[in-house]
């Protein structure tokens, strides 16, 4: 067993976990992040699509963009722009409603930011310099003698990780499995009101030179449509970038039907979604060169926000739950949730 006891352990290297880690490390504490996958950023995720030997292009199959309304997050976004991490992608998206494609509503023309190299750049930027243990799936959490003990999935040979304080930034259903017993009855009842809907994402490749100048993104507002979102992903890339890609996100109700589907069945779902997309964006969308389908089990949190944007469990040692599901969704909500929890933890440490 490792004898190292960290000041803080964070489960999950999504936006909220990385945001919290940055603020905690800034205060001089020792923080370690445990991430079950190889990548950083959670649903701010990018797939590297191979076009030919030695040529790959990024395609965003998770979070598509982000806005910045809070002043603190606006400052962060300004720094990212200076560093070349992100850029202003769009001032508004078209909507599909009542069988008609509508121009962006001036009322909702906030700047939408994206990343030239893919949305995973956010996780890479936030994770720089941190102590991160990748491919560490936390199977159980115990508290003993004032220390949190995080145990890896039995299939891994990783030693437990120990810390005096714990932040869990995993999707809420997974967080509940790990530390739900540490929460009060009121907190458990509150979390039961938050749902995390799934999403089927389709990445479709089209012939080089294909252009889609009319729209960057389309928000689908038809209640019975299997589609919730369509993006011309190539509009995020440099003009001379190879490849031509669209991304389709399915609505939660449609996606729920495919949670247990095989790879072959998922491709069928992707083909169905492209047929629907063609009715909105044009028949050309139903003639891809290739398509890849990804399944997000926890994609769309819906429900009330937690007071302060996070939850603190009523246990002897600090335990926080953070994430966009507790703070209105969106990347900005995730970033602020982690920041708020970190500042609350630091205040409690400072005041004893």
Label each residue range with its predicted role.
Residues 65-69, 101-125, 260-269:
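Short beta-strand to alpha-helix junction loop
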Residues 2-16:
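Beta1/beta-strand and adjacent pyrophosphate-binding region of the FAD-binding site
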Residues 134-149:
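A conserved short coil-to-beta-strand element within the FAD-binding core of flavoproteins
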Residues 41, 54-56, 163-217, 280:
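Central helical "cap/lid" subdomain
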Residues 39, 48, 242-352:
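Conserved flavin/dinucleotide-binding core of flavoenzymes
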Residues 4-6, 156-165:
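Core beta-strand elements of the Rossmann-like FAD/NAD(P) dinucleotide-binding domain
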Residues 46-94:
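N-terminal FAD cofactor-binding segment of flavoenzymes
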Residues 25-52:
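Glycine-rich FAD pyrophosphate-binding loop
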């Amino acid at each position: 067993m490792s004898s190292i006891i960290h000041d803080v352990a964070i489960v999950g290297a999504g936006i909220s976990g990385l945001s919290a880690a940055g603020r905690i490390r800034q205060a001089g504490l020792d923080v370690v992040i445990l991430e079950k996958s190889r990548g950083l950023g959670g649903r701010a995720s990018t797939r590297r699509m191979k076009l030919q030997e030695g040529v790959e292009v990024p395609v965003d199959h998770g979070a598509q963009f982000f806005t910045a309304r809070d002043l603190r997050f606006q400052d962060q976004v300004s720094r990212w722009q200076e560093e070349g991490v992100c850029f202003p992608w769009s001032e508004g998206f078209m909507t599909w409603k009542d069988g008609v494609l509508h121009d962006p509503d001036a009322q909702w023309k906030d700047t939408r930011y994206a990343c030239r190299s893919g949305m995973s750049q956010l996780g890479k930027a936030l994770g720089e310099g941190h102590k991160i243990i990748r491919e560490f799936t936390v199977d159980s959490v115990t508290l003993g003698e004032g220390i949190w003990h995080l145990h890896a999935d039995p299939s891994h040979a990783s030693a437990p990780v120990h810390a005096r304080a714990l932040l869990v930034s995993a999707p809420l259903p997974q967080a509940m499995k790990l530390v739900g017993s540490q929460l009060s009855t009121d907190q458990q009842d509150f979390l039961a009101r938050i749902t995390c809907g799934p999403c089927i994402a389709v990445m479709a490749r089209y012939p080089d030179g294909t252009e889609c100048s009319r729209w960057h993104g389309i928000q689908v507002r038809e209640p019975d449509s299997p589609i919730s979102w369509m993006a011309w992903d190539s509009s995020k890339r440099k003009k001379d970038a190879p490849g031509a890609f669209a991304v389709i996100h399915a609505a939660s109700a449609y996606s729920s039907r495919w949670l247990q589907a095989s790879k072959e069945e998922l491709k069928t779902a992707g083909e169905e979604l492209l047929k629907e997309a063609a009715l909105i964006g044009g028949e050309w969308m139903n003639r891809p060169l290739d398509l890849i389908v990804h399944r997000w089990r926890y994609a769309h949190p819906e429900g009330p926000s937690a007071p302060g944007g996070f939850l603190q469990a009523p246990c002897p040692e600090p335990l926080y739950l953070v994430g966009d599901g507790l703070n209105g969704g969106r990347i900005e909500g995730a970033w602020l949730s982690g920041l708020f929890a970190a500042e609350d933890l630091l205040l409690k440490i400072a005041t004893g």
